[in-house]
Regions:
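Extreme N-terminal leader/targeting regions
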Residues: 61-62, 74
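Hydrophobic/aromatic pocket-lining and membrane-interface residues
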Residues: 48, 74, 95
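Residue-level signature of transmembrane alpha-helix interfaces in integral membrane proteins
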Residues: 24-25, 29, 94, 110, ...
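Glycine-rich phosphate/adenosyl-contacting loop at the front of the ribokinase-like
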Residues: 1-58, 65-68, 138
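Conserved beta-strand edge residues that scaffold enzyme active sites
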Residues: 62-63, 88-89
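Ribokinase/PfkB-type carbohydrate-kinase core domain
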Residues: 1-10, 56, 68-86, 98-142
Length: 142
């Protein structure tokens, strides 16, 4: 069987459940908060792994507590993330405010995702599919 190779972003998603999305300059009290593994690259890799694909992931995290949570999540899968790079800055993250209807607003901070060193990425042997997405620098995708 051919391998699936994902080169992409890893984010820790901070999801705040709220009665509604605040208006400009307004603060409201949220109902709950969740910290969820995310990033398009990370989500693609985990989904492929959960569906039985032999999956490799190349990406970049920072040297912060979010990086520890992200790598711990990957350790609980069979995704090979030995190509994961570690930078000195902040890991990627997003903050989403989700209202009861499901509508949401979000902001993404790419952090170390923007500093993936494409020259140090080696495509694993027997790779049949390469997945890329737009949460990383275009030069990495090229």
């Amino acid at each position: 069987m051919k391998n699936l190779f994902v080169v992409g972003s890893l984010h820790l998603d901070v999801i705040v459940k709220s009665p509604r999305i605040p208006q400009k300059d307004e603060t409201i009290i949220g109902k709950s908060v969740e910290y969820v593994f995310g990033g398009k690259g990370g989500n693609q890799a985990l989904a492929a792994d959960q569906n039985g694909a032999s999956t490799f992931l190349a990406g970049r995290v920072g040297s912060d507590s979010f990086a520890k949570l992200l790598t711990a999540h990957l350790q609980n899968s069979s995704v090979d993330f030995s190509a994961l790079q570690v930078g000195t800055g902040a890991s990627g993250m997003s903050v989403a405010i989700v209202e009861e209807s499901g509508e949401y607003s979000a902001a993404v901070v790419s952090g170390e995702n923007l500093h993936i060193d494409e020259k140090s990425i080696e495509v694993p042997e027997n790779t049949g599919v390469l997945l890329l997405q737009n949460e990383i620098n275009d030069k990495v995708n090229l």
